[in-house]
């Protein structure tokens, strides 16, 4: 079987209004999280990476080790999160399957991503399957793995259209992959309180 072409898209252009600053600038223990998120996807075997950012952050992330080829500038980031996805989709080949992730879920690990990919590959038609990690209690997590046959549908989305519409329209194609003992795929950071919670979990794990 041919090696699947996995294209990770990291959505990182949000203004972070509730957080108080752009989410791409999230730090834990004084370390920028976005480069670590990108490394997790590379370690998991993603051959392609598109990191969608605001124009004013380009130099910062070039200095942090990301490449110009990996960075995608969203010229209108306040149009909605899906506007960032649409920017990245311009780089996606018809052979690419997508792993869509948000930078405000920083504790994703390469192991979790690999578990998702392995389970997705085990189904009869991965290209026609959408997969996500889920908690033992059924809570959906991240990233979202989208088989290549759904990419044309995504390209028709409006800039302010929620990504969950893809799941709503294709319920029979959804594969939930249970991930136990790992809060990383389910912990989003939208407020200072959530940031402090995640930081405390990291401190407790030391």
Regions found by a protein language model. Give the residues of each.
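Residue-level signal for inorganic ion chemistry
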Residues: 10, 22, 34, 49, ...
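Short glycine-enriched, charge-decorated loop/helix-capping segments at active-site entrances
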Residues: 22-27, 74
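Conserved beta-loop-beta/alpha segment of the NTase-like Rossmann-fold superfamily
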Residues: 78-153
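Short catalytic helix/loop segments, enriched in acidic residues and glycine
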Residues: 26-38
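Conserved N-terminal catalytic core of the sugar/cofactor nucleotidyltransferase
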Residues: 35-100, 110, 118
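Short beta-strand/turn micro-motifs composed of small residues
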Residues: 12, 52-53, 102, 134
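Conserved alpha/beta core of the MobA/IspD/sugar-nucleotide pyrophosphorylase nucleotidyltransferase superfamily
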Residues: 2-4, 152, 156-206
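N-terminal nucleotide-binding beta1-loop-alpha1 segment
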Residues: 1-21, 191
């Amino acid at each position: 079987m041919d090696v699947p072409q996995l294209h990770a898209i990291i959505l990182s252009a949000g203004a972070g209004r509730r957080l108080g600053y752009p989410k791409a600038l999230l730090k834990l223990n004084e370390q920028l999280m976005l480069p670590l998120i990108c490394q997790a996807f590379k370690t998991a075997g993603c051959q392609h990476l598109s990191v969608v950012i605001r124009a004013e952050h380009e130099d910062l992330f070039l200095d942090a080790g990301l490449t110009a080829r990996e960075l995608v500038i969203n010229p209108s980031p306040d149009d909605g999160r899906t506007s960032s996805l649409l920017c990245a989709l311009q780089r996606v080949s018809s052979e690419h399957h997508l792993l869509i992730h948000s930078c405000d879920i920083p504790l994703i690990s390469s192991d979790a991503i690999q578990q998702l990919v392995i389970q997705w590959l085990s189904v009869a038609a991965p290209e026609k399957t959408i997969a996500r990690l889920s908690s033992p209690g059924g809570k959906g997590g991240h990233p979202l793995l989208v088989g290549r046959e759904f990419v044309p549908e995504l390209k028709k989305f409006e800039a302010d259209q929620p990504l969950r519409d893809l799941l709503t329209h294709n319920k029979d194609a959804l594969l939930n992959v249970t991930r136990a003992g790992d809060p990383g795929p389910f912990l989003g950071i939208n407020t200072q309180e959530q940031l402090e919670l995640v930081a405390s979990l990291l401190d407790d794990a030391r």
